[in-house]
Design a protein with these regions (language model features):
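Non-catalytic, mobile gating and regulatory segments of ester bond hydrolases
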Residues: 1-194
Length: 194
């Protein structure tokens, strides 16, 4: 039986031929655990450029109602393709040539191969990724990361990174036994509205 890396390598049909499905969601969710290069736009930078939904409502200009409504509904998606992100991160190298940060107990070569398989696959390579947000606070015992993907159809897919195997990750997992929501859950609930 194949695994998610096999799927990322072999399922090359485009989304028009085979619509987005659970396995694709798993690929994008797994990708959120990997390193995200600097070329992927950060949510804070996007918000400073376009504002939050609340900011866009306040900036409505009755002299330009059509443009204002478009910006209100859907600001432009700032993103880079998965292929470009892979190139920025790995520079075409067959082995990881950077300090891999987000793999936990996973072999960095496996992480590298997974990223490269997605970037080389026509099904995934053109998907854009943006609005990356990452927070890590040892004092608050919280970690959070999310990235938004833009599919060729125009649909957005939000992928959240769960806790990792760090001490902060373990503490956050234990905190969930008696605290609701933990700070990362509150941030996750706020993320789509930003």
């Amino acid at each position: 039986m194949g695994n998610i890396i096999d799927y990322a390598r072999t399922e090359t049909r485009d989304f028009g031929e085979l619509p987005f499905r659970e396995a694709d969601a798993l690929v994008l969710a797994q990708l959120s655990y990997d390193d995200v290069p600097e070329c992927v736009p950060r949510l804070d930078d996007i918000e400073s450029r376009y504002g939050t939904l609340h900011d866009r409502v306040k900036q409505f200009d009755p002299r330009h109602p059509i443009r204002s409504v478009r910006m209100l509904r859907k600001p432009p998606f700032d993103g880079v393709t998965i292929a470009r992100a892979d190139d920025e991160l790995h520079h075409g190298s067959a082995v990881p040539d950077h300090n891999v940060e987000n793999v936990g107990l996973v072999d960095p070569q496996v992480t590298h191969d997974f990223y490269h398989a997605i970037a080389a696959n026509p099904r995934f390579s053109g998907i854009e990724m943006g609005a990356f947000l990452e927070q890590f606070d040892g004092d608050e015992q919280t970690q959070f990361a999310a990235v938004t993907y833009l599919l060729p159809s125009g649909a957005l897919v939000v992928a959240y990174r769960g806790t990792d195997d760090s001490l902060v990750g373990w503490k956050e997992d234990f905190n969930m036994a008696f605290q609701y929501p933990v700070p990362a859950q509150a941030t996750a609930a706020d993320y789509p509205g930003r």
